[in-house]
């Protein structure tokens, strides 16, 4: 019974590490993907949200100009 809390803590740590690895892989895959047309100025973040590139102005898809 004594080692049960330790086991739970280790399990939590392992699951958060797995989520971190999966998130970074997804992020890398989205960054590598080339965009065509008007989306060329838009960067995709890990959650699929659109974010303006700071280098480009007149970035319409995300609503800011």
UniProtKB/Swiss-Prot annotation:
Q: Which InterPro entries match?
A: T-conotoxin (IPR031565)
Report if keyword Signal is assigned.
Answer: yes
For the modification Cysteine amide, which residues carry it?
62
Q: Propeptide per record: which residue ranges?
A: 19-49
Range of residues in the leader sequence: 1-18
Entry's Gene Ontology cellular component terms = extracellular region
Disulfide pairings:
52-62, 53-59
GO MF term list: ion channel regulator activity; toxin activity
Q: What is the similarity comment for this entry?
A: Belongs to the conotoxin T superfamily.
Q: What is the purpose of this protein?
A: Probable neurotoxin with unknown target. Possibly targets ion channels.
Q: What is known of its domains?
A: The cysteine framework is X (CC-CX[hydroxyPro]C).
Instruction: Report the protein name in the record.
Output: Conotoxin Cal1.3
């Amino acid at each position: 019974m004594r080692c049960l809390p330790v086991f739970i803590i280790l399990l939590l740590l392992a699951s958060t590490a797995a989520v971190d690895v999966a998130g970074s892989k997804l992020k890398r895959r989205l960054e590598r993907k080339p965009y065509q047309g008007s989306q060329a100025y838009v960067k995709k973040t890990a959650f699929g949200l659109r974010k303006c590139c700071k280098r480009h102005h007149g970035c319409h898809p995300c609503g800011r100009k």
